[in-house]
Structure formats: structure tokens, C-alpha cells
């Protein structure tokens, strides 16, 4: 939850990170959203739900925790609706029909016309699409950006581990560290802006 808050605060301080390219046009978002996938159960073939959380500028760590826990609980316990319900319907379609429906959705995406019920809970349309690989005991990776939606930042959070570090006074100490892999759409800002943001 600390990482989610840190990512959101960084984007508030570096607003160009909250932009995206769609249909060969540049857009600036009005709000910061963080999206991820929540498994219903930690099992190989468990269903997944898509979750998007709005990040107000003044939120606290307690609010982050309540919002994340609440959204994940809802995603795991309630019947799928919105984009999750649409995905349940789409996966039952014959392949030719599915291919046609996907073509329509991708065309709507190009023109920025994807319906709200498909967009609002889809992490592909969030400011940042996060994956917490540490929750399944995996290290961080550099995840590709998707060719659908408007998410310009992918963040993969790894496992928390112990690492020996040298403190400011020269002494050695063992601290908890976590690696995070960020993949960024280089069209929204230059390397200098990204480097200063990270």
C-alpha cells in the first residue's frame, strides 16, 4: 500500500506522467487511477477480477489501505459486472464472433470511444497498471505496455527481501528492500523527465 501511495504522490508531483497517447493524439488525465488484477483465490485456475482505484491528492496510508482492501474484497466476493462481466460473456463467444467484437472494441479504443462500463474498472485505462508479483513470491520484472487502453506506465512489484546497505555514517545495516520494474511509454515524456520522476 505504501508503494501505491508513493506512485500516486509522484504522479501528482510530476503531472506529465498522467498523460497518454491514443489514436495518435496526446491527452492529459484529470485524475490519477491505479489498476491491478485481483485473483479470487490463490489457486492456479482461480478467476480474476480487474480493479481500478482513484487516487485523490490528499489521501493517507490508512485511506489507501481501506480503499484497496475494500475493492479487493468486493472483487473477490461479488458477482462480476462491468468489464469483468463483459469478459465473462466474451469468453463464451465462438472465435469468429469474438474476433469481430474485439475488432470493434479496438476501433472504439483508437477513437477514444470505449463505453464507460468497459473502461471504468479496466486497469488498461488506469494511469498506472500495477502487478504485485511479490504477493505470489516472484521477483519484479519489466512488463510490456499493452496495445489496448491508455495506461502509459506498467509497474511490477517484486518480493520484499533483506539486503545489506551502507548507512550515511558508513556503518552496515540490514534493511527490507523491494525491486520495482517500471515500463514507461516514452512518447509521453523524455528520458530526463522520467529519470527525475523515478
Segments the model singles out, each with a brief description of its role:
Residues 1-198:
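C-terminal catalytic/motor cores of large multi-domain enzyme assemblies
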Amino acid at each position: 500500500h505504501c508503494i501505491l501511495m508513493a506512485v500516486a504522490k509522484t504522479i501528482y508531483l510530476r503531472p506529465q506522467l498522467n498523460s497518454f497517447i491514443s489514436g495518435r493524439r496526446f491527452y492529459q488525465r484529470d485524475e490519477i487511477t491505479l489498476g491491478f488484477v485481483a485473483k479470487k483465490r490463490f489457486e492456479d485456475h482461480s478467476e480474476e477480477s480487474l480493479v481500478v482505484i482513484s487516487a485523490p491528492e490528499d489521501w493517507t496510508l490508512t485511506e489507501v489501505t481501506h480503499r484497496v482492501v475494500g475493492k479487493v474484497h468486493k472483487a473477490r466476493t461479488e458477482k462480476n459486472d462491468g468489464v469483468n462481466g463483459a469478459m465473462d460473456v466474451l469468453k463464451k463467444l465462438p472465435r469468429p464472433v469474438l474476433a469481430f467484437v474485439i475488432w470493434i472494441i479496438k476501433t472504439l479504443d483508437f477513437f477514444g470511444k470505449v463505453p464507460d462500463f468497459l473502461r471504468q474498472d479496466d486497469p488498461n485505462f488506469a494511469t498506472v497498471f500495477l502487478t504485485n508479483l511479490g504477493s505470489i513470491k516472484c521477483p519484479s520484472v519489466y512488463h510490456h505496455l499493452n496495445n489496448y487502453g491508455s495506461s502509459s506506465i506498467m509497474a511490477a512489484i517484486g518480493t520484499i527481501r533483506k539486503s545489506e546497505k551502507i548507512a550515511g555514517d558508513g556503518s552496515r545495516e540490514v534493511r527490507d528492500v523491494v525491486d520495482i520494474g517500471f515500463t514507461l511509454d516514452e512518447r509521453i515524456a523524455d528520458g530526463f523527465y522520467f529519470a527525475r520522476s523515478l
